[in-house]
């Protein structure tokens, strides 16, 4: 599933082609996504794009009359393409722009979303979200406070959007390795110093992944059709049985809440 770096990479890739251009119309080839494509999107016409923003894993396209909320789901990607390029099997939604380009949404598993809202505030998919991990609001003191009474393992807690948004399976595993923290540790057992370190490395890991265009393991592509290259730098995720790049101990894979977790027994305590 695309996580924060992949969504931010998509935002940065599409923004220059959308802001300042006008949506001439939308084409919905298959509206049966995770939720049905909003009827307002079918009727879009002559709408200038004012901004392209991100909240958590949602892309937010600001138009004069409202907002398009896009979620990439499990396998979605957004590409900027020439209008004349014919669609392929899994190209479900596109915005035809005044500059001769199209924003084309591809989603083999159809678990994403294209929604419309007049106002962002109070929309059900955006309520109850924690702070952005790259913001000043997410820091060691905040993390320590939120972990203090939490009697669950730190790995699934990091993936809870009420704590912090956008830290999914890949980056939770990678960040815990970078901080030397075992994923099975109770969240409440982390000291303030450990929380400060963990908050710092989460920011560093996410920023590095954004620099590399995100992580492509299967379906994710950047807006120019290229894969994300952070997969080449993964320290533990997807490396079961391979030697740790630091100490040589074989990487272990377990499951938390049906999600694979990767770690080094020697480096993480």
From Swiss-Prot:
Its EC number is 3.2.2.23, 4.2.99.18. Disulfide bonds: none annotated. InterPro entries: DNA_glyclase/AP_lyase_DNA-bd, DNA_glyclase_Znf_dom_DNA_BS, Formamido-pyr_DNA_Glyclase, FPG_cat, MutM-like_N-ter, Ribosomal_uS13-like_H2TH, Znf_DNA_glyclase/AP_lyase, Znf_FPG/IleRS. The keyword Ribosomal protein does not apply. Transmembrane segments: none annotated. A zinc finger (FPG-type) spans 235-269. GO terms for molecular function: 8-oxo-7,8-dihydroguanine DNA N-glycosylase activity; class I DNA-(apurinic or apyrimidinic site) endonuclease activity; damaged DNA binding; zinc ion binding. Signal peptide: none annotated. DNA binds at residues 90, 109, 150. The active site is at residues 2-3, 57, 259. Binds 1 zinc ion per subunit. The keyword Cell inner membrane does not apply. Keywords: DNA damage, DNA repair, DNA-binding, Glycosidase, Hydrolase, Lyase, Metal-binding, Multifunctional enzyme, Zinc, Zinc-finger. Its cofactor is Zn(2+). Monomer. PANTHER family: FORMAMIDOPYRIMIDINE-DNA GLYCOSYLASE (PTHR22993:SF9). Belongs to the FPG family. Involved in base excision repair of DNA damaged by oxidation or by mutagenic agents. Acts as a DNA glycosylase that recognizes and removes damaged bases. Has a preference for oxidized purines, such as 7,8-dihydro-8-oxoguanine (8-oxoG). Has AP (apurinic/apyrimidinic) lyase activity and introduces nicks in the DNA strand. Cleaves the DNA backbone by beta-delta elimination to generate a single-strand break at the site of the removed base with both 3'- and 5'-phosphates. This is Formamidopyrimidine-DNA glycosylase. The lineage of its organism: Bacteria, Pseudomonadati, Pseudomonadota, Gammaproteobacteria, Enterobacterales. The gene is mutM.
